[in-house]
Amino acid sequence: MKPKHILLAYSGGLDTSTALHFLKRHFDCRVTAYCANLGQKEDWERMKRRAAIAGADELVIEDLRETFIGDFVFPALKANASYERDYLLGTPLARPAIVKGLIEYARKHDVDCLSHGCTQKGNDQVRFEMAAKILAPDLPTVAPWRIWSLQSREDLFAYCQQHGIPVESRPDNLLSHDENLVHITTEGDYLESVANAFDWRDANWITPPTQAPDAIETITLGFRRGVPVSVDGAALGPVELVERLNEAGARNGVGFQDIIENRINGLKVRGVFENPALTILHAAHRKLEKITLGRDVERLRNLVSDDYGDIVYRGLWFSDERLCLQALIDESQKYVSGDVKVQLYKGSCTPCAVESEQSLYSRELVTLHAGRAISGEDATGFLNTLGLRIGIEAARAGNTGAGA
């Protein structure tokens, strides 16, 4: 059935501007462009003009920054979530935030079809459509990349030139970027050859470590139940806190990653990520957990962290499995409150001191000096008990103590 009102997730870039024009021509129906403000640096007036030229009946811009950080980034931070123990999930966390806003708008404005500008080769089509299937299974999705004849970014640029759509991409600069409040990515062009080193002239946020200040900068992060709430003693909201850490990390060369990851479809892809705030937050959060989580709780949390990151990466933020893991994670964080000092210096991020009223660390019990010492009698009893199982296993193996 031909749609009457398509709602397109719109970034204003080459892909979605081409998609907008294509949808309007191909379906000849109302097309609303929906842009979620997740903290990307954008000329909103220019975006409005571009969307109008590309054929949008309306451009909607919604500020989702607080929702993005508070409801998506911070819950994942509590899990220390990453993908393949490397990628800090800046894009996979953004996609469900966008889809949630998109569908909430769709429900209020008689939208009968969703659309996106994700390519048929990448991960984002999965993230968009899995989230949409969970939140709005009744709304179909149309993906221009899967039905038009265009095959490359060069083709898209030529299409926009042909139809007078102003885009910032150039045929001689085909790097692709995705930006939000917690990271900016750089992909494509010369980076598609893993033999090529990243050219620091293409960095967007981060000062090259060799050009960063020669003095260490120390900041103090405050956490409450696993959630960051302050910087240097000043209580901050989620957006302002992340912005402050981005500035501090970027000027000190912190948060650069050059990653080769395994896509959802199994193919390997290379991306460069600049995520100063996330890098600082992850380091500080892990340090605080070291004194506030019991050994076995920490081990259990670590067991699910990889699964959590994999679930988010595969576009299943709204799935039952993510919600189950989140309940466990949230319970693990009830004592993760305190302050962490972090040193930033020429690309390094080093937690150097930590304090918490919920600390399980007892200096008195572990000191090398006089204190509440564990007696020799206590230690002997502990070792005898600890060795019972090992002794039984050794006897079974025939280890009589006579040598090999």
Swiss-Prot record:
Entry binding sites for ATP: A9, Y10, S11, G12, G13, L14, D15, T16, S17, A36, G117
Primary location class: cytoplasm
Substrates-to-products reaction catalysed: L-citrulline + L-aspartate + ATP = 2-(N(omega)-L-arginino)succinate + AMP + diphosphate + H(+)
Pathway linked to the protein: Amino-acid biosynthesis; L-arginine biosynthesis; L-arginine from L-ornithine and carbamoyl phosphate: step 2/3
One GO BP: argininosuccinate metabolic process
One Pfam family linked to the record: Arginosuc_synth
Residues where L-citrulline binds: Y87, N123, R127, S176, E261
Residue sites binding L-aspartate per the record: T119, N123, D124
Gene Ontology CC terms: cytoplasm
Record key words, sorted: Amino-acid biosynthesis, Arginine biosynthesis, ATP-binding, Cytoplasm, Ligase, Nucleotide-binding
EC number: 6.3.4.5
GO MF entries: argininosuccinate synthase activity; ATP binding
Protein location: Cytoplasm
Highest taxon of source: Bacteria
NCBIfam families reported for this sequence: argG (TIGR00032), PRK00509.1 (NF001770)
UniProt family annotation: Belongs to the argininosuccinate synthase family. Type 1 subfamily.
Subunit field text: Homotetramer.
PANTHER family: ARGININOSUCCINATE SYNTHASE (PTHR11587:SF2)
Protein name: Argininosuccinate synthase
Record lineage: Bacteria, Pseudomonadati, Pseudomonadota, Betaproteobacteria, Burkholderiales
